[in-house]
Regions:
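OB-fold (S1/OB) nucleic-acid-binding surfaces
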Residues: 92-113
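Well-ordered alpha/beta subsegment
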Residues: 113-180
Length: 180
């Protein structure tokens, strides 16, 4: 089989191995989650029938099977409960260290704990109890076929959390944001 049979995105990885969700409204019933992320908000769904909130966002309530769900905002900061760092054998499309953490979003959050990726943190620096904040980042887009209507190119984002440093905490508290 020739190499041209496998679609490649900018020679980074085969599209057939794309680990990011297709976020377009036409292909995803939880597309409001991604629209909210584009606005810098981490959200999930809560059932209007029974009040259950669950993460990740759902299209059917896992408690009562209702489809009457609403999007609610989750905190954009949390504390590290436990974490793991992968330094070798990191999956294609990621770089070391690949850090995942269970974070506590606080007692008032509708979803108490969340498993997330941690970015912008050198290996060996993260500690249990560290404060983290939401970071939204762009992920590669690729053409999505829509049958006879052609293709679309969907802007895509995803989220992770990053350590809150004294410097970034100072910027947030004083509403001073660096300009690029």
């Amino acid at each position: 089989m020739s190499s041209s049979a496998i679609p490649v995105l900018e020679d980074l990885y085969p599209v057939t191995m794309d680990m990011w969700p297709i976020e377009a409204r036409e292909f995803n019933r939880v597309h409001p989650f991604y629209e909210n992320l584009k606005a810098g908000k981490l959200t999930t769904t809560r059932c209007r029938a029974c009040g259950a909130a669950s993460y990740p966002p759902r299209v059917i309530c896992p408690e009562c099977y209702s489809e009457d769900l609403e999007y609610i905002e989750l905190p954009d900061q949390g504390k590290v409960v436990v974490f793991s760092e992968t330094l070798k054998g990191v999956p294609l499309g990621f770089s070391a260290p690949l850090i995942h953490a269970t974070i506590d979003l606080g007692k008032d959050s509708p979803v108490r704990r969340l498993l997330t990726r941690v970015m912008n943190c050198p290996a060996g620096q993260l500690k249990e109890g560290d404060d983290l904040r939401l970071v939204v980042f762009e992920v590669p887009s690729h053409p999505i076929e829509k049958g006879k209507k052609g293709t679309i190119l969907s802007e895509r984002v995803f989220f992770a959390f990053e350590p809150v440093t004294r410097y970034s905490r100072h910027l947030q508290e004083n509403l001073i944001y660096p300009h690029s």
